[in-house]
Amino acid sequence: MKSDIRNLDLNLLKALDALLDERSVTRAAARLALTQPAVSGMLTRLRDAFNDPLFIRAPHGMVPTLRAQALAAPVKQLLTDAETLLQPVVFDPLEADFTWTIAATDYALKAVIVPFIAALKPMAPGIRVRIIPESPATLLAQTERGEVDIALLTPHDTPPELHSRALYQEEYVCLLREDHPQANQPLTLDRFCALEHVLVSWQGDSFRGVTDDALAALGRTQRVGLSVSSFLVLPEVLAVSEMIAVVPRRLAKMASGMKIAAPPLAIPGFTKSMAWHERNHRDPAQQWLRELLLQTSQQER
């Protein structure tokens, strides 16, 4: 008769292993911290499962049958493998070899990912980082399928089903070239509104942004002469024109040959956060990478 593995569990296999080692129900019970009747009952279940007596009573203990002897090594291996499965996963950055996919805007690429990579590579040279464009509309599905490990976005764009953590609070500043006629003069509200502006919008097709909302509250407007979809082109545009731009401070600090000025009005900043799926939440490697991302983003102030 064929044995049914569904009749077995780890506790029964532990009992069989102890019985094979001890050759005594009493000693096996003591080793397992169980009562003798409990181990006797387990032996009965084992005999039924394997359709074999397994042990024969003898004057000096129990003698294993040939079937029991044949089971000894496989049972020990199964228990060892099961124990290994239950051990906490140990993550070693130096030995890690996998790809981590980040969804990010060009702003996050420069402000967050560049310093992150600088810290990551000496610590975990085998981890490859893939950057893909951030798409809030498809982000949840991408994280569910494992296509994105982490996304860098704002709380407003974060799907509620994802875990998230704030990285830092960003503020806006004005950016213009160092030799701009306005560079060494106080930037008044009137002058700010009179200057021609470069605006960054997601699609590059909008001429209204957060600055316009702040100005509207004061009954003022700005003069937008160029709308682009990327922050990264701004320094080049500003370097060859007399335009001005309102940009996140972290990007402004990275631009060479530029002058940073405080806006003449209050412009609300934003929170940059990271978001990830429950499927990655408890993985030691993912936890380590998220912590490193948090540390490096908070150092770049």
Go through the PLM ranges and name each one.
Residues 95-159, 221, 228:
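Central regulatory/effector-binding core of bacterial HTH transcription factors
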Residues 112, 178, 189, 260-301:
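A late-sequence structural motif
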Residues 17-34:
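Short helix-boundary/capping micro-motifs
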Residues 94, 161-197, 286-287:
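Flexible hinge/capping segments at coil-to-helix
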Residues 60, 66, 90-109, 123-127, ...:
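Interdomain hinge and pocket-entrance segments immediately C-terminal to HTH DNA-binding domains
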Residues 160-166, 170, 229-281:
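Beta-alpha-beta core module
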Residues 182-184, 189, 197-218, 282-286, ...:
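Secondary-structure junction motif
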Residues 47-69:
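A short LG(V/I)-centered, amphipathic sequence patch enriched
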